[in-house]
Amino acid sequence: MPTVNQLIRKPRVTPVKRNKVPALQSNPQKRGVCTRVYTTTPKKPNSALRKVAKVRLTSGFEVIGYIPGEGHNLQEHSVVMIRGGRVKDLPGVRYHIIRGLLDTQGVKNRKQRRSKYGAKRPK
């Protein structure tokens, strides 16, 4: 533990917090247009074809967004809303596309956690 004199000479420095979602510019969501919709493979222990889209945001950033859920209707020039939230096994994917909003349809036949996937309540 430093002495009072040592603290006067060299005060404590708080580490700088790095922004994990810079493209959102402190907004909860941002709108963008899909420039490319494709699949990619996850990191080492996992194996799948994960659906992702390259999105040009209204702020001018070009980011990669993950498309959650089973099946989607996105293609080039689709208008989407993006939120923060990385995908742990996909390097470079730090955003999620919001389902059931703008051009993105909700997940069909979804019974649980429907609000997360933009699915209406089944009759």
Curated annotation (Swiss-Prot):
One of its GO terms (molecular function) is structural constituent of ribosome. GO terms for biological process: translation. GO terms for cellular component: small ribosomal subunit. SUPFAM superfamilies: Nucleic acid-binding proteins (SSF50249). Keywords: Methylation, Ribonucleoprotein, Ribosomal protein, RNA-binding, rRNA-binding, tRNA-binding. InterPro entries: NA-bd_OB-fold, Ribosomal_uS12, Ribosomal_uS12_bac. It comes from the Bacteria. The modification 3-methylthioaspartic acid is found at D89. Pfam families: Ribosom_S12_S23 (PF00164). NCBIfam families: rpsL_bact. HAMAP family: Ribosomal_uS12_B. Part of the 30S ribosomal subunit. Contacts proteins S8 and S17. May interact with IF1 in the 30S initiation complex. With S4 and S5 plays an important role in translational accuracy. Belongs to the universal ribosomal protein uS12 family. This is Small ribosomal subunit protein uS12. The gene is rpsL.
